[in-house]
Curated annotation (Swiss-Prot):
Heme b 2 binds at residues 86, 187. GO terms for biological process: photosynthesis; respiratory electron transport chain. HAMAP family: Cytb6_f_cytb6. This is Cytochrome b6. It is found in: Plastid, Chloroplast thylakoid membrane. Heme c binds at residue 35. The 4 large subunits of the cytochrome b6-f complex are cytochrome b6, subunit IV (17 kDa polypeptide, PetD), cytochrome f and the Rieske protein, while the 4 small subunits are PetG, PetL, PetM and PetN. The complex functions as a dimer. CDD domains: Cytochrome_b_N. The chain crosses the membrane at residues 32-52, 90-110, 116-136, 186-206. Binds 2 heme b groups non-covalently with two histidine residues as axial ligands. Binds one heme group covalently by a single cysteine link with no axial amino acid ligand. This heme was named heme ci. GO terms for molecular function: electron transporter, transferring electrons within cytochrome b6/f complex of photosystem II activity; metal ion binding; oxidoreductase activity. Component of the cytochrome b6-f complex, which mediates electron transfer between photosystem II (PSII) and photosystem I (PSI), cyclic electron flow around PSI, and state transitions. The lineage of its organism: Eukaryota, Viridiplantae, Streptophyta, Embryophyta, Tracheophyta. Belongs to the cytochrome b family. PetB subfamily.
């Protein structure tokens, strides 16, 4: 086993990387409230895992979406548990994100030189809200349908570009299969990819600049 480790160590300098990760200075003022961002990340990872599991059974069509969710809840092995954990962790992710934003704001963590860290955090907050909007529609029940209809109708009030923007969101003049397909694509591919990219940027900047000091 040591020979295998030595082989990788010689080429990748694993020990140096491990030392850099584990020896990072943590300021003495850091408390449990500084863990809220990490909890938000944990919730996101749970979302990815449980969401991926449900894609094996979910069918993104207006005729089969609701029945496929019912199948997950009643027939698929541990499907009810996976979907429930997905919903609970979604609520927890939103709550932890809000508390994290408040903590950063109240402790002045957005000030120079951490402005870009704050900007990426705001983008992540918007992406998190977008997860909620797109995911809410996927069961395609009465609540999901009317929620999508209302949300996608909001841009209608914008002058000039309102109507084209509504049609872009819905995929057609009215809410239907095109809308569900777009929301499913956003929820399972576009938003997770963007979130992963901005999280990486967020953490790299925190790693580079360190945790902000006390007020």
């Amino acid at each position: 086993m040591s020979k295998v480790y030595d082989w990788f160590e010689e080429r990748l300098e694993i020990q140096a990387i491990a030392d850099d990760i584990t020896s990072k200075y943590v300021p003495p003022h850091v408390n449990i409230f500084y863990c809220l961002g990490g909890i938000t990340l944990t919730c996101f990872l749970v979302q990815v895992a449980t969401g991926f599991a449900m894609t094996f059974y979910y069918r993104p069509t207006v005729t089969e979406a609701f029945s496929s969710v019912q199948y997950i809840m009643t027939e698929a092995n541990f499907g009810w548990l996976i979907r429930s954990v997905h919903r609970w962790s979604a609520s927890m992710m939103v709550l932890m994100m809000i508390l994290h934003v408040f903590r950063v704001y109240l402790t002045g963590g957005f000030k120079k030189p951490r402005e870009l860290t704050w900007v990426t955090g705001v983008v992540l907050a918007v992406l998190t809200a977008s997860f909620g909007v797109t995911g809410y529609s996927l069961p395609w029940d009465q609540i999901g349908y009317w929620a999508v209809k209302i949300v996608t109708g909001v841009p209608e009030a914008i002058p000039v570009i309102g109507s084209p923007l509504v049609e872009l969101l819905r995929g057609s003049a009215s809410v239907g299969q095109s809308t569900l397909t777009r929301f499913y694509s956003l929820h399972t591919f576009v938003l997770p990819l963007l979130t992963a990219v901005f999280m990486l940027m967020h953490f790299l900047m925190i790693r580079k600049q360190g945790i902000s000091g006390p007020l």
